[in-house]
């Protein structure tokens, strides 16, 4: 007996309906995951560079600065960290790239439209040879908001005077408010 193989119209319609249902359920969840991962990568990038700067300052016994820099060669006079930043050995500790200072890392501007703004107009953080953060108010926050500016995605980087840092989600944690 010669039987033809293939799908019937009913089987095909059921398959299409199942796939459409799964996509309808899955796409919003996927968007949530991609937004969450993008925000986490952005905040962790700055946190990692701040921790690197602090450890380099302690290791080398001289100040190391992290500052906003769109061009990657000098510090900008702004507190909008989404435009990029640099980490450099700051021999005289003046939070400016001078002769003799060595740029250790460069972070390019965000490709997203997320905003990353520091409280107290902090555009540079200098860690001294003991690892303390100079030039900031205690509890300085650098807040990261996604382009929709919803609280679901808000993350903050908290830095205190002794150089301790923590990444926070929206709300109040250990007396520090991230909003």
Which residues does each PLM region occupy?
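N-terminal leader/signal peptides at the extreme start of proteins
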Residues: 1-9
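Residues within membrane-spanning alpha-helices of integral membrane proteins
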Residues: 17-18
